[in-house]
Amino acid sequence: GKTPRIIEMWPGLYEKGLFGLAIDLGSTTIAAHLTDLKSGDVLKSAGVMNPQIRFGEDLMSRVSYSMMNVGGDKEMTTVVREAINSLAKQLIIDAEIEKNALVEVVFVCNPVMHHLLLGIDPVELGQAPFALASSNAMTVRTSELDLTEMNPSGMCYILPCIAGHVGADAAAVALSEEPNKSNDLVLVVDVGTNAEILLGCLLYTSPSPRDSCA
C-alpha cells in the first residue's frame, strides 16, 4: 500500500470532522459539493461561472487563445484556481468549518479544463490527433495547485481522462452509473458546453462539442 502521510495535527481529541470537496470543473460552470468524509453526506453545495469564459465561450476558443497569446494558458490556469479558492471559501463559511479540516478534493473535468487546472498548455488538443499530455489519474497536494482555501497538505485527486475530448467527467459518470453492467442498452448524455455521450451495454463514448451542433 501507499505510505501514510500526516496531513494535519490537532491538540487533544479532535472530533470536529474531516471534509472533502467534489468539484465538477466545467467549461461554463464550476460546481462543488462539500462532503463529510466519514459519513459521505453532502453538507453544502455551490456553483460559480468559470471565469475562463472571458477568454473564450467554448473549449476550442480557449485553446485558440492559448495558441495566439504567449502565456495565455497561464492566465487561464490562474483565474480558474482563484475561482476554485473562492468557491471553497464560500462553502467553508456556509458550513462553519475550519479551513484546515478540508483535507481532500476530487476533480472531474473535460481534457482542456484538466490541462488548464494542472498548468499544462492545452494547445495539442486543438488539432488532430488531439493528444493528451497525460490521461492518467493524478494525486497532488492542494498547495501544488495553489489551492489556498483548504489544508495546504491536503490531497487533490484528479480522475483520468479517457481520450482526446472525452474527459474525467465522462469517466466519473461511467464509474457511478455503470451502464456497461446493464442488460439493457443504456444511453447517458452529459449536456454541457462540451457534451459527452456514453452508450452501453458495451461501453462506447464520444465527445459532442457545442461547435459541432451549430
What is each residue range found by the language model?
Residues 39-41, 196, 203:
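Residue-level signal for well-ordered, solvent-exposed loop/turn and beta-edge residues enriched
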Residues 58, 116-172:
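Glycine-rich phosphate-binding loop and adjoining helix at the ATP-binding site
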